[in-house]
UniProtKB/Swiss-Prot annotation:
The chain crosses the membrane at residues 16-36, 388-408, 450-470, 485-505, 531-551. NCBIfam families: PRK01318.2-4 (NF002357), yidC_nterm (TIGR03593), yidC_oxa1_cterm (TIGR03592). One of its GO terms (biological process) is protein insertion into membrane. GO terms for cellular component: plasma membrane. It is found in: Cell inner membrane. Interacts with the Sec translocase complex via SecD. Specifically interacts with transmembrane segments of nascent integral membrane proteins during membrane integration. It comes from Helicobacter hepaticus (strain ATCC 51449 / 3B1). InterPro entries: Membr_insert_YidC, Membr_insert_YidC_N, YidC/ALB3/OXA1/COX18, YidC/Oxa/ALB_C, YidC_ALB_C, YidC_periplasmic_sf. This is Membrane protein insertase YidC. Required for the insertion and/or proper folding and/or complex formation of integral membrane proteins into the membrane. Involved in integration of membrane proteins that insert both dependently and independently of the Sec translocase complex, as well as at least some lipoproteins. Aids folding of multispanning membrane proteins. It is a multi-pass membrane protein. The gene is yidC. The keyword Flavoprotein does not apply.
Amino acid sequence: MYRPNEQDNGMSLTRVLIAIGLSIAFFAIYAYFFPQKPHQNTHQAHTAQNTQDTQESIQASTHTEINTQVAPHQNIQDSTQSVQNEISSSAQMPHSLKQTIIARVDSDEFELEIDALGRIKQVYLKDEKFIRHEQTSLFAMIGEVLGMKPAHKEKRDKLPLFGDSQLHTMEMRFSDTSINQQAFDTPYTANISYIKLENAPVEIVLTQNLGNLVIKKYLTIHPNLAYDVRLELSKPNIEYFVSNGMRPTADTDTYAFRGVITRNNIDGVLTKFEDGDASSDYLAKNAADIRSSSFVASVDRYYTSLFFSNAPKGLYVVMSGDNAHNPMPYVRFEGDAEFAGYIGPKEYHELQGIENTLTDVVEYGRITFFAKPLFLLLEYLYDLCGNWGWAIVLLTLIVRIVLYPLTYKGMVSMQKLKDLAPKMKDLQTRYKDDPQKLQIHMMDLYKKHGANPLGGCLPLILQIPVFFAIYRVLHNAVELKSSAWILWITDLSAIDPYFVLPVLMGVSMYISQKLTPSNFTDPMQEKIFKMLPWVFTIFFIIFPFPAGLVLYWTINNVFSIIQQISINKIMEGKKAKEIAAHHDEKTNKRG
C-alpha cells in the first residue's frame, strides 16, 4: 500500500502551513496593530477619585516633568519649583468656580459652556449621528438578554464630549505661585452670558481681575467649532501655561488610539502620548520633539480638542501626566499671545478646511500612510453613489480588479497543480527512496508546465495590508459613524446586530474554498484547511468587527467566487481544446 513520505505531501503541506500561517498572522497582526486596552475609562476613574488625592498624585508623579521642559532660558531648578507650586495649587480650586457656568454659546449643531475659571467646560454635539449609540459587544448583548447586565439606552438629545473633573480646555496656570493661587480663587466675568450662533462667528470676552494683574481672554467662536484666541495680560513677561485639555471621553472604544498627538513644526513628525503610557521617562524622552509644534491635539476615536498655530516657531508644548499616566498637555506663553483651536469630531475635510496640517489628527495607526489615501478613495466613491456601504462594495471591486492579474496567475497555477497531481504521485512512488531525485524531477515538472506551488497564496498575502487599512478607515473615520447600508445594517462602524454578515462571510469563504483547486495528499491537512472558514466566522462573531469591514470581506469573497468560476471555465475550455488537439493528432497519425 502506498504511503506518502515527506516529499509526497511537501507542496500541499506548504500550502496548508501558509494558509494557517496567514490565519495566525491575521490574528497576531490584528493584536499588534489594534491592541486592546483594559476596558476602563481612565479619565472617568480619575474623575471618581477624591480631588485632593488626585492633585497630590499629580504633584508627586508628574510636576517635575513639566518643569524640566519649560523655560529653558531659566534656571531649571527655579522653573521646576515654580511650575510644581503652580500645579499643586489646582487642588485649591473652589468647587463653586468649577461648577458655575458664566457663558453659553448655542447653535443648531452644538452647545458650548464656559465656567467661572475661564475654561471651556463642556461641548455638546446635537447631530443625531453623534447621539446614536450602538451596542458594540456580543457578550454585552448576551448579558443584556439574560438580564445579567442592564441596558444603558438612555435617551439624550445631545452628546457631552468631556468628563466633569478632568483638565479642561483654556485652563491657565502661572509659574508664580501667588498669582496662580489668586487666579484659582478669582472668578472670570463674561461680557455676555448667552449667545445664539448662526452663520457668523461670535466673540466672548472673559476678564479676570487679580488686582495687580488683569487677564483678558478673547474667544472668537466659529460655526464649525473652530475658535481664535487672543490673550492679553496687563503686565509683561508673565510666564503661564494654557491647556487644550485632556482628551474627550465621549467614546469608550478601547482599540482606537486615545491620548495626545503633536506635530513638529519643522519636519512634520508626529509624537504620540497614549493614555496609560505617559510615564516620566517617556515624557522626558520626547520633551525636545514637542517644543515647536504646529498643533497639539487630545484625541479619542472620533473627537478631539486641539490648539494650533501658523507662527514660525509654532507652539511651545510641554507635557505632564496624571496619576494614571494619562497625558496632560500645556502650551507655554509669556505675555500676550494669539493662537487658534478646535473642539469636535475628527472629520477629515472639516479639519482640512480649518488648517491643512490638522488632517494628521485623524490617526490610523502604523499604517496611516496607506489608510489615508484609501479613505480618500472611499470618500470619492461615496460622493459618486451617496452610500458608504455601496462605496465599500465599489472599493472592493477596485481592489479585486487591481489584483486580478496576480489572482489569475495564482488561480491558474493552482489549477495546474491539481492537474499535475497524478504525475506528481507517480514521481513520488517512483523516487520514494531518493528524495533528492524526487525534488529535481518535481521542479522540472513544475517548470515544464509553468506551475508555481506558492502562486496561489500571493493574492491573499497582498490583501492583508488592504484589509487592515480598511479596518482602520472603517473603525476610525467619524464620517462613517451611524452610516447605514441596507436593511438591518444601520451603522457600518458598529457590529452587525444580528451577525448575518459574519455568517455570510463564512459561507462565501467556504464556497470559494470549495471552488479553488486543491491537491492535498494528507487528509488531516485537508481537514485543517477546510476548518479555516469556520474559524474566521467564529472569530468575527466572538470578537466582532465593524459591519463595514465584514461587508468588505464578504463582497471580496463573492468576487473571488465569480473570478474562480470564470477561471475554471477558461481552464476547462483550454483542457477541451488540448484533448481535441491530442485526439486530432492521434487520428492524423493513424491516417
